[in-house]
Amino acid sequence: LFGGHDAPLDQDAIPSVVFSHPPMGMVGITEEQAREEHRRVHVARAGFRPMLHALADSPQRSLFKIVCVGPERHVVGIHLLGEAADEILQGFAVAMRRGITLEDLRDSIAIHPTSAEELVLMD
């Protein structure tokens, strides 16, 4: 099927989503796992009310967290709870697998107004 080439499966890079309301998902390792495995851990968090819910005067909020390690702040975990988390996670999972850093995210131009923009605005 794959031309006779074996490829190891990186189980830390498999995104997982719960299609609840609101949806939640994660890829990579948790903050606790990062602290056990690495000396330098940086965690960026964002809590916000998505534009859709703000305009509708709904109390629903979203919580996003990015776990980074090392002086370069390589992203090793992304955890999302909120509007569109299920859709947002896939692209960021690919970026994380390719070695993205928090600085790479900060250098991106955000699409506004979206929940995904919170991930590139976090520090």
Pin down the residues of each PLM region:
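Flexible, glycine-rich terminal cap/loop adjacent to redox cofactors
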Residues: 2-7, 14, 19-123
